[in-house]
Amino acid sequence: MAGQKIRIRLKAYDHEAIDASAKKIVETVTRTGARVVGPVPLPTEKNVYCVIRSPHKYKDSREHFEMRTHKRLIDILDPTPKTVDALMRIDLPASVDVNIQ
């Protein structure tokens, strides 16, 4: 698989979980002999929801909630079959969304 590249995108609401997962992936890949670029922090997506506190009136009294989606990008250069096998076996938390290209 010389000259190829695997791109892994991680998404999570918890920044500690995504950093721990990225560290685990980088350690696994470097142990198998492939080169790693990253983890590269991508812009955090912030969704803000505005909710009226009262069910009927008092429209001026509102509450804001926000959800932050943290993202990381990891590139694996020149992966070996051993690297791909190790990535398939790695155990990551359910709160981290992994997209492999």
Swiss-Prot record:
SUPFAM superfamilies noted in UniProt: Ribosomal protein S10
GO molecular function (one): structural constituent of ribosome
Keyword entries, A-Z: Ribonucleoprotein, Ribosomal protein
Biological process (GO), any one: translation
Domain of life: Bacteria
Keyword match Cell membrane: no
GO cellular component, one term: ribonucleoprotein complex
InterPro entries: Ribosomal_uS10, Ribosomal_uS10_CS, Ribosomal_uS10_dom, Ribosomal_uS10_dom_sf
Family annotation (Pfam families): Ribosomal_S10 (PF00338)
Cystine residue pairs: none
HAMAP family hit by this protein: Ribosomal_uS10
Function: Involved in the binding of tRNA to the ribosomes.
Assembly and binders: Part of the 30S ribosomal subunit.
Protein family (similarity comment): Belongs to the universal ribosomal protein uS10 family.
Annotated protein name in UniProt: Small ribosomal subunit protein uS10
Organism: Corynebacterium jeikeium (strain K411)
Gene giving rise to this polypeptide: rpsJ
